[in-house]
Regions:
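Conserved donor-binding/catalytic core segment of Leloir-type glycosyltransferases
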Residues: 6-8, 165-184
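Active-site and donor-binding regions of nucleotide-sugar-utilizing enzymes
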Residues: 4-158, 179
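Short, surface-exposed amphipathic charged segments that create phosphate/polyanion-binding patches used
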Residues: 71-76, 161-172
């Protein structure tokens, strides 16, 4: 029998997306919850996270199936990760579990086939137009305001916490925008 557990994962082979800073925040602000970060043992981020006190679990090793099944909340930055995507669309995730999709960035393209075909109880978004685009009537999305939470992204909050402590510049590289990418070439 598992204690109240939240399972976090950016990607099976890397950290540094939205799940990592949310884990850092939640382990301080939700101390009664057991926090587990999922990442492969062979990943270069493993040692860095271990030194920072993360409770780590290799998704290819023993104990992962039990941790997934026992987690109250599963918090993911990438719902398409090959090691977990099938679990979201099958009996691999219980109806009593909550699946939170942190996303990687603002949804700008029509992703309804991917979103609608995946078990998502909460989708985190960053902007009002994004939230409206995901929840409005007469769109292809089946999401509602109940599932889509406009909270911003944890890694952006982490950047804000660095103000005045480290570098004071941020370089924006909109590589997701083909028009801007072509203009920069």
């Amino acid at each position: 029998d598992w204690p109240r557990t939240w399972l976090y994962m950016d990607r099976h082979d890397s950290a540094g997306d939205n799940a990592e800073p949310l884990y850092r925040y939640a382990r301080t602000h939700a101390p009664s919850v057991r926090h587990i970060f999922v990442i492969e043992r062979t990943c270069p981020d493993w040692d860095r996270l271990a030194q920072d006190g993360f409770v780590l679990l290799d998704p290819t090793g023993p104990g992962f199936d039990a941790a997934w099944a026992g987690a109250e909340t599963i918090i993911l930055s990438d719902i398409g990760d090959p090691l977990i995507k099938d679990r979201l669309n099958s009996a691999g995730t219980g109806t009593d579990q909550r699946v939170v999709f942190l996303q990687h960035g603002v949804t700008m393209r029509d992703m309804w086939r991917w979103f609608n075909g995946t078990r998502l109880d909460v989708v985190v978004c960053a902007t009002a137009p994004e939230q409206a685009g995901l929840t409005a009537d007469h769109t292809s999305y089946t999401l509602t305001d109940r599932e889509v939470w406009r909270t911003g992204f944890p890694r952006h909050d982490h950047l804000h916490s660095l103000l005045g402590r480290e570098r004071d510049s941020i370089l924006l590289a909109p590589t997701w925008d083909p028009e801007v990418s072509r203009a920069l070439e």
